[in-house]
């Protein structure tokens, strides 16, 4: 959960997640939709899917016990070199280097490493430094300490050098380059993406949802059918809902900001009359907004469907 996400954001999600899934067996036994439901709002949903896949593998291949070897651990979905090293260092006291974002920042500044870690040569250098710096004793304490140092003192903006125990020998501080190191990755040009989503309503208060592809935005989550144009959305309505629906009409505008782009969503509302599209298991479903089930939904879609659950708005949308 902490990958690419701040601690303050993670804590309430972590508590709910651990209450529902106290061990690997509970996680493996749960449907992936419930896992995604509890992850909804954290983003980077591949993390949740990989966590569930890893739990299944641990149960099937390792008898429900976390592997103790680096190679077996790193072979699990979603666990790379740094995560495997951190798990073994913290949980088993085994000596393995780590290179998460916090450790990378500390090492880059302390040793004065120039260049972006996205460059393979720089990444290799940082791994070498991490290996060299990892002690043979009390490795669990060191691993936690370097992560905490990067998270609370050697922060990305306005590092607190006066409080840093490594300040005296830190090359970045001695040369006044704390704000230059580590070198940032090249920023992507921010853009706006516009889409149309069909809100197909039935009289029983349910809305048609489709599962999104696992790759891409909101991977694996359930969402309103999405289209790049109103024309394509209209063709979907005529081809899939046919005589069962009136012509779509708009219902406000939704805006959502991602890390590198902004998403504008135009909801096109149709009322399904009489017969309606049959769903394909695992691909589409009718979701009752008044009695929501525990499935993975993108945060802005959850908010929108909650608005639909309001009686007056739901009735207005169906007129």
Where would I find each of the regions flagged by the language model?
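Intrinsically disordered, low-complexity regions enriched for glutamine and histidine
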Residues: 1-2, 258
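Catalytic cores of DNA base-excision repair glycosylases
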Residues: 2-179, 242
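Intrinsically disordered, low-complexity, charged terminal extensions of DNA damage-control enzymes
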Residues: 151-319
């Amino acid at each position: 959960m902490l990958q690419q996400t701040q601690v303050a954001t993670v804590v309430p999600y972590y508590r709910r997640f651990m209450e529902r899934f106290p061990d690997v067996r509970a996680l493996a036994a749960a449907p992936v939709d419930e896992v995604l439901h509890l992850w909804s709002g954290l983003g980077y949903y591949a993390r949740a899917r990989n966590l569930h896949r890893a739990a299944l593998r641990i149960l099937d291949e390792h008898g429900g016990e976390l592997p103790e070897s680096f190679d077996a651990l790193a072979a699990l979905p979603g666990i790379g070199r740094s995560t495997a090293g951190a798990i073994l260092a913290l949980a088993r006291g085994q000596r393995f280097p780590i290179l998460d974002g916090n450790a990378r920042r500390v090492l880059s500044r302390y040793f004065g490493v120039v260049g972006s870690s996205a460059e393979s040569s720089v990444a290799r250098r940082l791994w070498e430094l991490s290996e060299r710096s990892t002690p043979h004793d009390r490795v669990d304490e060191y691993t936690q300490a370097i992560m905490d140092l990067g998270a609370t003192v050697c922060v990305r903006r306005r590092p607190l050098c006066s409080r840093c125990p490594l300040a005296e020998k830190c090359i970045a501080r001695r040369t006044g380059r704390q704000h230059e190191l580590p070198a940032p990755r090249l920023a992507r040009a921010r853009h706006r993406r516009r889409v149309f989503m069909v809100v197909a309503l039935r009289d029983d208060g349910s809305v048609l949802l489709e599962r999104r592809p696992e790759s891409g935005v909101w991977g694996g989550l359930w969402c309103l059918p999405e289209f790049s144009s109103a024309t394509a959305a209209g063709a979907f309505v005529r081809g899939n809902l046919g005589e069962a629906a009136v012509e779509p009409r708009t219902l406000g505008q939704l805006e959502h900001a991602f890390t590198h782009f902004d998403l504008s969503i135009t909801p096109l509302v149709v009322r399904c009359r009489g017969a309606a599209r049959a769903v394909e298991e695992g691909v589409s479903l009718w979701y009752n907004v008044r009695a929501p089930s525990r499935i993975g939904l993108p945060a802005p879609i959850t908010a929108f469907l909650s608005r639909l659950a309001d009686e007056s708005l739901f009735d207005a949308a169906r007129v």
